[in-house]
Regions:
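Hydrophobic transmembrane alpha-helices
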Residues: 1-49
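Positively charged n-region of N-terminal signal peptides that target proteins for export
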Residues: 1-5, 57, 99
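Hydrophobic alpha-helical transmembrane segments
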Residues: 7-12, 45, 60-64, 80-85, ...
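Alpha-helical transmembrane segments of multipass membrane proteins
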Residues: 17-21, 47, 90, 94, ...
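Interfacial aromatic-anchored transmembrane helix boundaries in multi-pass membrane proteins
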Residues: 21-40, 65-95, 105, 125-137
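Hydrophobic side chains within alpha-helical segments
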Residues: 27, 42, 47, 69, ...
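Membrane-embedded alpha-helical hairpins and interfacial helices in multi-pass inner-membrane proteins
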Residues: 34-36, 76-81, 99-182
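Generic transmembrane alpha-helix motif of multi-pass integral membrane proteins
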Residues: 40-56, 93-98
Length: 182
């Protein structure tokens, strides 16, 4: 793929991830799960897409730009540290989890959601200088199972649709990962 096409695809995916992240602010998830800081992680659908179809390097680039721009547009420096730490840890775990033959996209997504929460707890511990925050982690990990599964289900549905549409960048995906998507 040439540089211009790769850059355009990365910019489009970053914009999509930013849009999903912004849209997620309007979903009243606290009505269902009354815990502070809980989000669905819809932008992770884009990260999963990039990881599976375009590679970990592209996924990392999209993650960096999304976290940076998202913080500039509506979060500030503290939000950046929460977002980038959770995102980097989630991506690293998903890169490793994807290699496990028994994990589908659902499992990879749940692992990423759990890692994201761990990353955010680590930032909170540093900011508050208190280990008591770790008491909140079990609740976040339980939520990660649900949100990670939902994000994985959305990703799997999107992936199946893209493979069925026979998009050019999905040909390798079908041969390699189609069994692990379902």
């Amino acid at each position: 793929m040439d540089k211009t096409r790769r850059l355009a695809r990365g910019a489009l995916l970053t914009a999509l991830a930013l849009g999903l992240s912004y849209m997620e602010r309007f979903i009243p998830l606290q009505l269902l799960v009354p815990l502070p800081g809980i989000k669905l992680g819809l932008a992770n659908v884009v990260t999963l897409f990039a990881l599976y179809f375009l590679g970990s390097r592209t996924a990392l680039q999209i993650l960096w730009v999304r976290c940076l721009l998202g913080s500039l547009f509506g979060g500030g420096i503290t939000a950046f540290f929460f977002s980038i730490t959770g995102g980097l840890l989630a991506l690293a775990v998903m890169v490793l989890a994807r290699r496990l033959p028994f994990l589908s996209i659902y499992g990879v997504s749940v692992c990423g959601a759990a890692a994201h929460h761990v990353g955010q707890i680590l930032v909170t511990v540093v900011l508050l200088r208190s280990g008591y925050v770790f008491a909140y982690l079990p609740f976040l990990l339980l939520v990660a199972i649900g949100t990670g599964f939902l994000t994985g289900a959305i990703s799997a549905a999107c992936f199946r649709a893209m493979i069925a549409a026979d998009l050019p960048f999905t040909s390798n995906m079908e041969a390699t990962y189609v069994g692990k998507i379902h």
